[in-house]
Amino acid sequence: MEKQELVKRYIETLISSPINLVGYDNFEEAYHFLYIDSTLPMKAEDLGQKFIDVGTGGGVPGVFLAIEFGASGFLIDSVCKKIEYVKNKCEELKIENLEFLCIRAEELKDKGPYREYFDSAVSRAVSKIATVLELTAPYVKVGGKILLYKGPGYTEELGQSVNAMKELGVKLSEVRKYTIKGKDRFLIVFEKFDKTPEKYPRKVGIPEKRPIR
């Protein structure tokens, strides 16, 4: 199946889902604010061979990145019915370069060889930057990237994340600005320059309640 046909079919499964996966029920809106938003600022070399999508929800951005760039994705979310639905739909569409797991990011460190395992991590609409860095950095290789999709309010979050970056072994690499139907969007790119201390991520809920300051 051609890329664009796969994208079309997958968007249709999202907007017609019996469970609330995305905030769109109109194809054109979903196409722009889910697919284009996921892929426009991204480059194949950002992802490497294998990426993790933390808090994937309806498979965004992970499914679209796997289709567009061919990288292998590991998609996790704490809501099992969402992961199960996305997994089943991807199997129906024969999107084969994806794995799925229903789990909290804080618990992944105890499940298999995932610490500093992935070439990159992506996350969209999960939480503030300091929190998401704690949930992603432990699973990215030194030299890998963490790519976070944000709106115009990212600057304040970034300012509050300086200590988290130092503590987790990541640094800001660049900010890519792009526009979707007149709305400014930003891809915040971090590079992992050092190993993340073993104590991270902390226990479930702590990164959200008490971000590293």
Question: What do these predicted ranges mean?
Answer:
Residues 109-120:
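A short acidic, Gly/Pro-enriched loop at the edge of an enzyme's catalytic core
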Residues 1-48, 52, 81, 87-98:
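Class I SAM-dependent transferase core
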Residues 119-131, 138, 152:
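A short SAM/SAH-binding and catalytic strip from SAM-dependent methyltransferases
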